[in-house]
Amino acid sequence: MKTPIRVAVTGAAGQIAYSLLFRIAAGDMLGEDQPVILQLLDIPQSLPSLKGVVMELDDCAFPLLRDITITDDPKTAFRDINIAMLVGARPRTKGMERKDLLEANGTIFRAQGKALDEVAGRDVKVLVVGNPANTNAYITMKNAPSLKPTSFSSMMRLDHNRAVFQLAVKVGQPVSSVRKMIVWGNHSSAQYPDLSHAEVDGHNAADLVNDMAWIETGFIPVIQKRGMEVIEARGSSSAASAANAAICHMRDWVSGTPEGDWVSMGIPSDGSYGIPEGVIYGYPVTCQGGEYKIVPDLEISEFSRMKMQASYRELMGERESIKHLLG
């Protein structure tokens, strides 16, 4: 039997985590032969509720689940971990400006970055789900200087999956036929879902759709606004779909992307595609051996470049507002 992998999940008593933890314990993320130890973090007032979640996990009798720790201390939660899924974040409340949300969450992720730096395994893989995810990931990374920058990522996979579904519906094919979707930039309404390189059963998606008006006024805005539409429909934000995206993101990062396909991940920019260093930016990547690599040499249209730069400018604006929290 393999050595158990230690997985930390923050915001562990919350809605996304409730859809996430049982799937991790069942082997959906790391495989059906990989034991796991869950190290769960939440704020003190949520620990009674979290104890109930742990009771449910116990009652599932998952063969792969070796142990569970619950705590309100980041250092306890992150000690010797291999994977961190930073789900917990302060939600935006009525009347709250985005800069106030950035500040409130920046303080949380600064502390978590410092704790990761001090006690996490040196090979740790960190996925930030809590919004604003890209900038929260950047704050976490900058406060963990002893860890490799490539250890940090933010979640673009929910946007990616949404884009795959919308394209599949448009062309009347199953989602399994869609490959090479990209969502560039920030996980926000400035993101750029790009189907210009996507394929449906090996055929170029843009050629199949053959409708630039739909791409510009249908496809792109639908993906950008989908999260808000979910909130309006169910009264709360995406939870099960976000948890599923987190599972997909980490599974592919650890085990590799399928042959002939790529995925979208928020990662530290390195100058690729004209995006300067200094932000966590959504890129198309392939994963192998636990490492990701940006897909090189894609042709970028003027329309795409304009959208990509707009998302970059938004990220730079976010970074400017929290620069005092960067280590």
Curated annotation (Swiss-Prot):
Catalytic reactions on record: (S)-malate + NAD(+) = oxaloacetate + NADH + H(+)
The keyword Oxidoreductase appears for this protein: yes
UniProt keywords, alphabetically: NAD, Oxidoreductase, Tricarboxylic acid cycle
Active site, per annotation: 187 (proton acceptor)
EC number(s) given by UniProt: 1.1.1.37
Keyword flag Chaperone: no
Classification via CDD domains: MDH_chloroplast-like (cd01338)
SUPFAM superfamilies in UniProt: LDH C-terminal domain-like, NAD(P)-binding Rossmann-fold domains
Gene3D superfamilies in the cross-refs: Lactate dehydrogenase/glycoside hydrolase, family 4, C-terminal (3.90.110.10), NAD(P)-binding Rossmann-like Domain (3.40.50.720)
Binding-site positions, NAD(+): 11-17, 105, 112, 129-131
PANTHER family for the chain: MALATE DEHYDROGENASE
Family annotation (HAMAP family): Malate_dehydrog_2 (MF_01517)
The name this protein goes by in its record: Malate dehydrogenase
Species for this entry: Nitrosospira multiformis (strain ATCC 25196 / NCIMB 11849 / C 71)
Gene: mdh
